[in-house]
Amino acid sequence: MIRKCTEHGYFRGGSCQQCKRPGRYVLDDSREEKLGRFVSGTLRHFPASAGVKMDEYGWVDLNAFCDVMKKRYNWMRKEYLYALVESDEKGRYQIRGFMIRARYGHSVNIELDYEESDAPYVYYGASPEEVDVLLENGIFPIKQRYVHLSTSYEKAAEVALIHTESPVILQVDAFRAQEDGISLKLATDYIVLAEKIPPEYLYVIEE
């Protein structure tokens, strides 16, 4: 459920995390899920099939996108898109002026115009079965356009636990990689994107 606090804006759940007030009802769980799936799919995977034009950096026209969603969901209002984006704790989407895009997770071919990460190390969580292959060959994107790395050990472990019960965390020597010309783009406070990570920059963090 998405609600709106007059002081702190849109939030998910029953009360504002900052002031604990209930706020104004905006969107129920069912509609939030439907919109979320469509927004994610369109901005990351199938913009053309959904009927929206995407530029080289992943931006689409917000008003045109809303029109497409209104045709699909007759209850759709532009406020719902703002509510979905602004209440998303993972920061998956970005609105700038009258444009909207996904920050990460793309399978479509887009270019990254984010700033370079200044973290000396970034992290990648893997299953025990993957580790030897990664240390030998490096990390390459599989279903997504870019390799997704985490800015902290904890975040890497959190992501890896979705896929394996016993994650192994690899540390990436980001400083040395960038010195050697590998671009590491900061998509959010927690996610760094790269074309690939060669094996010479990878180290297993021993528990």
From Swiss-Prot:
Keywords assigned by UniProt, alphabetized: NAD, Transferase
GO biological process terms held by the UniProt record: tRNA splicing, via endonucleolytic cleavage and ligation
Molecular function, one GO term: NAD+ poly-ADP-ribosyltransferase activity
Pfam families, A to Z: PTS_2-RNA
EC number: 2.7.1.-
The UniProt record lists the keyword NAD: yes
SUPFAM superfamilies, per the entry: ADP-ribosylation (SSF56399)
Keyword NAD attributed: yes
Job description of the protein: Removes the 2'-phosphate from RNA via an intermediate in which the phosphate is ADP-ribosylated by NAD followed by a presumed transesterification to release the RNA and generate ADP-ribose 1''-2''-cyclic phosphate (APPR>P). May function as an ADP-ribosylase.
Family: Belongs to the KptA/TPT1 family.
Designated name of the protein: Probable RNA 2'-phosphotransferase
Organism the protein comes from: Methanosarcina acetivorans (strain ATCC 35395 / DSM 2834 / JCM 12185 / C2A)
Lineage: Archaea, Methanobacteriati, Methanobacteriota, Stenosarchaea group, Methanomicrobia
Gene coding for it: kptA
